[in-house]
Curated annotation (Swiss-Prot):
A carbohydrate binds at residues 12, 99-100, 228. Pfam families: Lectin_legB. InterPro entries: ConA-like_dom_sf (IPR013320), Lectin_LegA_CS (IPR000985), Lectin_legB_Mn/Ca_BS (IPR019825), Legume_lectin_dom (IPR001220), Leguminous_Lectin (IPR050258). GO terms for molecular function: D-mannose binding; metal ion binding; toxin activity. This is Concanavalin-Br. Glucose/D-mannose specific lectin. Has anti-inflammatory activity in rats. Induces histamine release in mast cells from hamster and rat. Induces lymphocyte proliferation and IFNG production. Shows toxicity against the aquatic snail B.glabrata at concentrations higher than 20 ug/ml.
Amino acid sequence: ADTIVAVELDTYPNTDIGDPSYPHIGIDIKSVRSKKTAKWNMQNGKVGTAHIIYNSVGKRLSAVVSYPNGDSATVSYDVDLDNVLPEWVRVGLSASTGLYKETNTILSWSFTSKLKSNSTHETNALHFMFNQFSKDQKDLILQGDATTGTEGNLRLTRVSSNGSPQGSSVGRALFYAPVHIWESSAVVASFEATFTFLIKSPDSHPADGIAFFISNIDSSIPSGSTGRLLGLFPDAN
């Protein structure tokens, strides 16, 4: 199975797999059962921003999800990522729908990682920024139902021709270049990611959510990972 670290924006409470009984953001380490969650007032049809940071000195992964009206949710978890992830990874965005559905639209996405090493005092950095997504976005690996180009956006899950979200859909987009996320000689490894998103649903229960994830470089969508598994995990263990 893939090695996954993720920050989930979970719109549907699957209490049978340990979710709290409300929409939440959570930090997932190798399992869809979040290590830490925080209540999240998801605003249907409003553009939100997710900001994720990690620093190897504090060994803390943190996320803030906010809306223009000032409503925000914050979650953080202490984890040493070099004990969890391989040295080289890919970063991506994933989303799914199940019985219930929602649009999982990404309007922008940026990422920066830095590795400061002792030996040379050098910093290795990788940075990318998408303020829009073109139809033929060569620097993204699209998996499942993910598509780019409609109104300059990245759509992670399927929508019908009139824009209605479809159920039982899963899609992911990964940046094409592998990221050197840690190195034994590095003094500091850090990264930050930001994306803006629009989740819209005609249902009273939108589902299932969007996640920012870091994985082994050859990661693919596990079979059967629509719905509550967010396109990331093969099962709910």
